Amino acid sequence: MARDGEIERIMETVIKPTKNGITTNLILYGDSGTGKTVTMRYLAREIRDPQVVYVNAIAYRYVKNVLIDFLSKFGIIVPERSSYASLFTRIEGLLRNQGKNVILVIDEAANILKGDYDGLYYLFRSKDSFDVNISTIFVVMEDPAILFDAKIRKSYGIFSEIKFRRYTKGEIYQIVMNRAVQSLTGEGYDEDVLDYIAEVSAEYGSARVGIDILAKAAHIAEYRRSPKISFDDVRAARSMISPFVTESKLASMDYEDLMVLLSICRCLSASRFTDVDCISRNLSVISEQYGKKDINLYDRIKRLENNGIISSSIEGQGRGEGVKKVISIYDIPVSVLTEKIENLLSA
């Protein structure tokens, strides 16, 4: 999960005050796949006092729906047309019997925050209006500044905000590693492949994307009857999530770009990354094969990078050895791309 810092802030902002009888309100926000939901489910499972109750509100438009769902988790069934007064009366009795305070987590809360101003007012003023001491944590993707204007903020009162930043490559690697240990046999993957999944997923900053690529790559390897996930399985999985290199994009490329791209593919046939030396060697062979010489390799590589076809990074070569540029393709299996390029060059 890699969210220890965020959990500590939630503990200090909401959980500890609520345990001491102080009502607080918090909004968690951040991009999809940044661990908001899994963090709140973890806290709902692990924290006993105060009690943390999780409700997914993606299908709800009103706070009233959330409160009815909340009560149902304790076996209390109420009519959908219940008034706020009757709902909070039932909640007040529940909390009295429980003998501890409650934090209500409302996930996928954007629709409610954008539209149910009356319901939110009742929820935020529940202590004053109904003597119900209930703290709330809203989970959304949008920045609260987009959801609330100054007038609405003043009406609702003070609440805190915590942004869940995007995961780093290292954090995604740890999450993917944990999932691989849980879900796959030890012979089904190696650390280089998991690191490559983290590399491919890092542009999204999303653990969800990394886990999805791992699952799809494992299925692809199984379909090939391979005992181990390959780099090309990862590329195939990535292309299933968000295809970028399409046939129309390839068809629009000029002859020399295709030749350089084919050289890169041949270097990557069994590798995660390649370098300019390997590409240059392969380009010499391909140039001879297709009768095209004097290609400016560096300009062509730069064009492919600018068009998003290839990705590159700078890697150190060890103490005193300097650095070099390494190149990879994330968005399509190089075996498939090789075949498509060869067909275009031969047409």
From Swiss-Prot:
Binding site for ATP: T34, G35, K36, T37, V38, Y167, R179
Secretion signal span: none
GO BP annotation list: DNA replication
Disulfide bridge map: none
One MF annotation (Gene Ontology) recorded for this entry: ATP hydrolysis activity
InterPro entries linked: AAA+_ATPase, AAA_22, Cdc6_lid, ORC1/CDC6, P-loop_NTPase, WH-like_DNA-bd_sf
Keyword Cell inner membrane: no
Superkingdom of origin organism: Archaea
CDD domains xref list: AAA (cd00009)
Keywords: ATP-binding, DNA replication, Nucleotide-binding
Known role: Involved in regulation of DNA replication. Has no effect on MCM helicase activity, either stimulatory or inhibitory. Does not bind DNA.
Homology family: Belongs to the CDC6/cdc18 family.
Descriptive protein name: Putative ORC1-type DNA replication protein 1
Organism whose genome encodes this protein: Thermoplasma acidophilum (strain ATCC 25905 / DSM 1728 / JCM 9062 / NBRC 15155 / AMRC-C165)
Lineage per the UniProt record: Archaea, Methanobacteriati, Thermoplasmatota, Thermoplasmata, Thermoplasmatales
Primary gene name: cdc6-1
